[in-house]
């Protein structure tokens, strides 16, 4: 499959192409020139467009400054030796000056912008090529050109801060998960460690007394049952303290996630999952989230549909998309192994198929929530 040809980097979208419309004005103005001057003018216009393209391709690189100098030099030549109206091309470098993150580089580029905008005006006025009235008509546009670098720089700062904030939030989430794991591990050790050790000792004692002292064996077995019930109660109390996500909540989250990824969402099936235990709902929610994350990251899909069917003894969840599907050798990559491991905890199963997109089917035996 051939890759689509892109003149400008894809991350800038359609914006660079819009600015190219403004090069039509100098192109038409050069038609009034003749001979060598016209040829040089069109040559500089080609160089200007090439520099414009290279500026987008070299953002953050050392060559960015060189191409900006080329663009400014072309504008200076146009507005001094051709016509003052070419100064409107200053909107191009004014945009790129705002790309500088370092204050020193920004100030230098801004001073250069001031020079290429004001020097031609003074030169043409002293040479009596333009009137004071014509200069005043240009003044509002000069002000906009000189203000725009600050606006562009402020916008990029905000984008950078938002990216850092998002990264910090992800780190906070990860730290919260780690803290929760440590807390659970500590609670399990404190609440179950002693009980499980006691059960181990009693099981060893029962093995030795099974033949010689049946009555004592029955008593120890009864105590083991009591201890195991106590351990089960402790586990349930521990789980109840955990923040679990219900299937209904996760469906809402999935809708928001898919909408952010420009993927339409359709849901069919049950809307009441109250009979399903919180632990089972939490595991199902994590599996659904993993499947949807795979769709957004890998499928290039435009639509996702989830169907949940509840039967007397089991639940079936089908997650399908209209994306490119996945190769057979990668079917159980991209987090699907993790989903399968989670489902094993509740005796569930996972199947993945490729039918006009990827189809992920989860089957979970239903264990109703304890009253």
UniProtKB/Swiss-Prot annotation:
Source domain of life: Bacteria
Membrane disposition: Multi-pass membrane protein
Cell location: Cell membrane
Protein's name according to its UniProt entry: Sensor histidine kinase YvfT
Organism: Bacillus subtilis (strain 168)
EC number: 2.7.13.3
Phylogenetic classification of the source organism: Bacteria, Bacillati, Bacillota, Bacilli, Bacillales
Keywords: ATP-binding, Cell membrane, Kinase, Membrane, Nucleotide-binding, Phosphoprotein, Transferase, Transmembrane, Transmembrane helix, Two-component regulatory system
Function, in words: Member of the two-component regulatory system YvfT/YvfU. Probably activates YvfU by phosphorylation.
